[in-house]
Amino acid sequence: MSRRLVALSTVATALDAERIATALVERGLAACVNVVPGVVSIYRWKGAVERDLELLLVIKTRADRFEALREALVSLHPYEVPELIALPVEAGHLPYLAWLDEATGEGRG
């Protein structure tokens, strides 16, 4: 069984958030993507400190799907350098974790 991950990304618009989230779930690269509006991002970009209102994508996936997820997200994302980081899931509700595995293709023939 592959390790489970929670991946994070941000986008500027609700349209982009829904488009990317839907594509990742439809392709079996994510079991679920939460879209969290109202995230204030403060970051350095091209020598200047920037501040933007963004939407956070909280993406539940498996480690063996991450590379395909990364390729898809980068191709769908409008940013020049999209944020994508992943954190390991150390524990969770076992029925939910089983569903995550099934929704991302674990055990399918």
Language-model regions, residue ranges each:
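Positively charged, small/polar-rich N-terminal and surface patches that mediate targeting and assembly
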Residues: M1-G109
